[in-house]
């Protein structure tokens, strides 16, 4: 996928496409605590080890510098894969995305954990590569994750994120279709696909996806924001304003609310100059 370009391509997508794609990496799923695998000795974690892992992840998120030092010390004392994963999480929290992604790649390569856990490592590595502006490596790791766990709908979404950021909207839609085939009731995925359809100027298909997302989640602010974009394109500024005002009312202070405010201001400037 050497045709991937940097994040500058996202400047062409002023909507909510892929805004939510990085959330899960901040949540840093407790891979080992959830799966019960990953120990270097017997393939499982004791209750004490699980608690240590959870505490390490929490510190890595809340106080990443302290978390990094703690994770390194745990690793050096024989903490194994869970400690190595915690080191990477701390690096992500510190904004050192390339180093985190490199460590996650190495961890996935060395891991003796079950395929679902390794796929999770690769998915997180892919997200870190995206944040490091390396979409080619992100796509590579996400593809590897899908080879291990092809029936996980979130992994298809993850790869669609990289494809969308690269401006490969048709390929992104293909991956989103596969995710929806596995789980049709994903409002967020319908919204992502609607944004991709909008970028391809397939506005009717985009509106269908947005309306279906709102059937599932009537107050979804991302869906309302996207519908506002579609109304604006159709020249229905009053309806666009209504949706964006709802976004601001229901999620004030969030990035999507800030984007809605900016869109209203731009629309008012254009209207005033006509």
Each model region followed by its residue ranges:
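N-terminal leader/linker segments that initiate helical-solenoid repeat arrays
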Residues: 28-86, 90-102, 272-274
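Terminal, low-structured helical/coil segments at or just beyond the last alpha-helical repeat
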Residues: 38-39, 44, 239-274
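Helix-start (N-cap) detector for alpha-helical repeat units in TPR-like alpha-solenoids
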Residues: 49, 81-82, 115, 119, ...
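Residue-level recognition of tetratricopeptide repeat
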Residues: 56-57, 89, 127, 161, ...
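Structural signature of tandem alpha-helical TPR/SEL1-like repeats
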Residues: 63-66, 95-102, 132-141, 166-178, ...
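Structural marker of alpha-solenoid helical repeat scaffolds
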Residues: 76-77, 110-114, 148, 182, ...
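Canonical tetratricopeptide repeat
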Residues: 86, 120, 124, 158, ...
């Amino acid at each position: 996928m050497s045709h991937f370009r940097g994040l500058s391509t996202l400047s062409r997508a002023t909507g909510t496409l892929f805004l939510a794609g990085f959330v899960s990496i901040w949540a840093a799923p407790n891979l080992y605590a959830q799966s019960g695998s990953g120990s270097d000795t017997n393939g499982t974690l004791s209750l004490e080890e699980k608690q240590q892992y959870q505490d390490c992840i929490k510190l890595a998120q809340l106080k990443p510098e302290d978390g990094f030092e703690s994770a390194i010390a745990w690793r050096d004392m024989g903490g194994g894969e869970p400690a190595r994963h915690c080191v990477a999480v701390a690096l992500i929290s510190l904004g050192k995305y390339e180093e985190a992604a490199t460590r996650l790649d190495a961890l996935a390569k060395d891991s003796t954990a079950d395929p679902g856990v390794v796929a999770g490592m690769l998915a997180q590595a892919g997200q870190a590569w995206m944040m490091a502006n390396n979409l080619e490596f992100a796509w590579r790791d996400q593809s590897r994750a899908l080879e291990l766990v092809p029936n996980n709908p979130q992994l298809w979404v993850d790869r669609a994120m990289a494809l969308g950021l690269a401006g490969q909207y048709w390929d992104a839609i293909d991956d989103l279709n596969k995710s929806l085939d596995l789980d049709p009731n994903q409002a967020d995925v319908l919204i992502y696909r609607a944004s991709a359809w909008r970028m391809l100027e397939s506005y009717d298909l985009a509106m269908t996806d947005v309306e279906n997302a709102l059937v599932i989640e009537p107050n979804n602010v991302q869906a309302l924001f996207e519908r506002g974009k579609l109304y604006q394109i159709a020249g229905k500024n009053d309806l666009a304003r209504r949706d964006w005002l709802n976004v601001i009312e229901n999620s004030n202070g969030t990035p999507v609310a800030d984007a809605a405010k900016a869109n209203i201001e731009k629309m008012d400037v254009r209207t005033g100059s006509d």
